């Protein structure tokens, strides 16, 4: 039996901030969103981070790096640094909030996250000014971690 015949798909809920504002997913690959840089993608490719469909779990799927997961997954940091990604949104717009989805990531989810943004048409550099949109916050495993943005 192929692992594609036994798939568990999660049910996702649209956050209140998105329902109320009629928000569009600015991080959608269909709009042209692109991941410019990631600190590591050993266990899960960056391309799995921007899927429009809800995450899926295949109990018996493995690849060259171990258990296949439907999301971006890094090796654990041992050098004191942080894992990060730089995402270019698919369109300019007002950000209503974020959904950091850890569905099916139970012991391998990030414990915390912080989200910063910049408005630029160029690739960010060391001198780029970043603005905090979501302060460092705890992230729950196997969940939609939703963070509305108020400013």
Where are the language model's segments positioned?
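A short glycine/threonine-centered beta-strand motif
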Residues: 89-91
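General structural concept
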Residues: 85-87, 96
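Trp- and acidic/polar-enriched beta-sheet ligand-binding modules for extracellular glycan
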Residues: 2-84, 105-151
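A short beta-strand element within beta-rich, extracytoplasmic domains
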Residues: 93-104
């Amino acid at each position: 039996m192929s692992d594609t015949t036994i798939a568990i798909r999660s049910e996702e809920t649209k956050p209140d901030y998105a329902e109320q504002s009629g928000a569009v997913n600015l991080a959608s690959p269909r709009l042209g969103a692109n991941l410019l840089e990631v600190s590591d993608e050993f266990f899960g490719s960056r391309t799995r981070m921007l899927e429009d469909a809800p995450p899926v779990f295949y109990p018996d799927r493995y690849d060259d790096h171990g258990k296949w997961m439907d999301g971006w997954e890094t090796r654990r940091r041992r050098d004191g640094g942080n894992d990060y990604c730089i995402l270019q949104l698919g369109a300019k717009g007002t950000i209503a909030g974020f959904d950091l989805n850890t569905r099916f990531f139970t012991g391998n989810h990030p414990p915390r996250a912080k989200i910063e943004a910049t408005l630029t048409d160029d690739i960010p550099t060391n001198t780029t000014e970043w603005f905090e949109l979501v302060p460092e916050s705890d992230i729950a495993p196997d969940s939609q971690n939703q963070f509305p943005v108020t400013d």
